[in-house]
Amino acid sequence: MFGPFKPAPHIAELPAEKIDSTYKRLRWQVFAGIFFGYAAYYFVRANFDLAQPGLIQAGLYSKAELGVIGSAAGLAYGLSKFVMAGMSDRSNPRVFLPFGLLLSGLCMTMMGLFPWATSGIAIMWVMIFLNGWFQGMGWPPCGRTMVHWWSKSERGTIVSIWNTAHNIGGMMPGAMVLLASAVFFSTHGIEAQAKDIWQQSLYYPGIAAMICAIPVY
């Protein structure tokens, strides 16, 4: 790997009396990073699904067209996990994880804020493909980090705890759509329909993901 993605340089070994306490503190600090970082990946993993009813209601796309567009996500994610796993093993996970999160959030933010990014099936397919590709940068550095910081006898427990990040992150886009509905109601005085907030379904989670990338780093 090159530039900031290169593995972190070796540092001098700590005095023996500091190793145990420092190790315990740092590995939970690292765990917090991969836990909340991976949870934030789920902000923009499937939030496009929440925007689809609005796109249909607004008459912009049909269900069949959105099905074609959505196929890009699974294709890209599968390919990316295969490719990015090898790259992650040769990189600095502190950079690799938040960088993918930042780019994934950027894709969704652009789709929500810039009309050109949702102006046609082809461009939307590309944007969803890119988002799926960047999503593949989430799991590999997390798995590698847990292997490095926890022994074999501890990994079952730590991976089980880490796995709850999926659930925490997965519930947030729905909460953000509710927030968008509340903002629309306070601004317009009427209840929001799906066609009124489909953009927010994309860029609210996108912006949140990009913000989360900062403390994760």
Q: Each PLM stretch: what is its role?
A:
Residues 127-165:
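Cytoplasmic helix-loop-helix junction between adjacent transmembrane helices
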Residues 160-182:
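Glycine-rich segments within core transmembrane alpha-helices of 12-TM secondary carriers
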